């Protein structure tokens, strides 16, 4: 069982961004937390981060994973290319946001990518990733 975790633009800057919105975790801390979860749960996890839409598309197009957690960052609000790629990916998938996008600026409240995911977790900090991973693990176990 392999789960891909994709982080979009500016998520590499966690720990340097507004701590009231994004918390104190660095991207390195987030990767370690996800990898630790994978080891404890017997799940292979790969964390991929890019600030470039095309690189995210190329990674998704490899289709070499059984489940997907994606935080598209700002691409959430306007990337129909990522939306279309997510539609191609026929695995359990969850969109995650560290901040509650529904309590932020108006332009951040619309997700064009969530509607092609199984669900969206928003506003629970980095722990939203763990909830998404738990869901995907359970869903994959049900399918086997």
From Swiss-Prot:
Binding site for substrate: 71, 77, 84, 98-99, 108
Pathway terms, separated by semicolons: Metabolic intermediate biosynthesis; chorismate biosynthesis; chorismate from D-erythrose 4-phosphate and phosphoenolpyruvate: step 3/7
Domain of life: Bacteria
Amino-acid biosynthesis found in the keyword field: yes
Gene Ontology biological process terms in this record: amino acid biosynthetic process; aromatic amino acid family biosynthetic process; chorismate biosynthetic process; quinate catabolic process
Record-linked PROSITE patterns: DEHYDROQUINASE_II
GO molecular function: 3-dehydroquinate dehydratase activity
Location of the active site: 22 (proton acceptor), 97 (proton donor)
Residue numbers marked as site, Transition state stabilizer: 17
Keywords: Amino-acid biosynthesis, Aromatic amino acid biosynthesis, Lyase
Pfam family, any one: DHquinase_II
Catalytic activity: 3-dehydroquinate = 3-dehydroshikimate + H2O
NCBIfam families assigned to the protein according to its UniProt record, in alphabetical order: aroQ, PRK05395.1-2, PRK05395.1-4
Known partners and oligomeric status: Homododecamer.
Family: Belongs to the type-II 3-dehydroquinase family.
PANTHER family found in the cross-reference section: CATABOLIC 3-DEHYDROQUINASE
The protein's name: 3-dehydroquinate dehydratase
């Amino acid at each position: 069982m392999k789960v891909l975790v994709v982080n979009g633009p500016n998520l590499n800057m966690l720990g340097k961004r507004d701590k009231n919105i994004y918390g104190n975790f660095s991207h390195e801390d987030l990767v370690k937390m996800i990898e630790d979860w994978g080891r404890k749960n017997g799940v292979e996890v790969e964390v991929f981060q890019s600030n470039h839409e095309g690189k995210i598309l190329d990674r998704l197009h490899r289709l070499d994973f059984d489940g997907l957690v994606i935080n598209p960052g700002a691409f959430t609000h306007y990337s129909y290319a990522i939306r279309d790629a997510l539609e191609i990916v026929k695995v359990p998938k969850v969109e995650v946001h560290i901040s509650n996008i529904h309590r932020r600026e108006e332009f951040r409240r619309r997700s064009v990518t969530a509607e092609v995911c199984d669900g969206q977790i928003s506003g629970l900090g980095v722990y939203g990733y763990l909830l998404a991973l738990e869901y995907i693990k359970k869903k994959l176990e049900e399918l086997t």
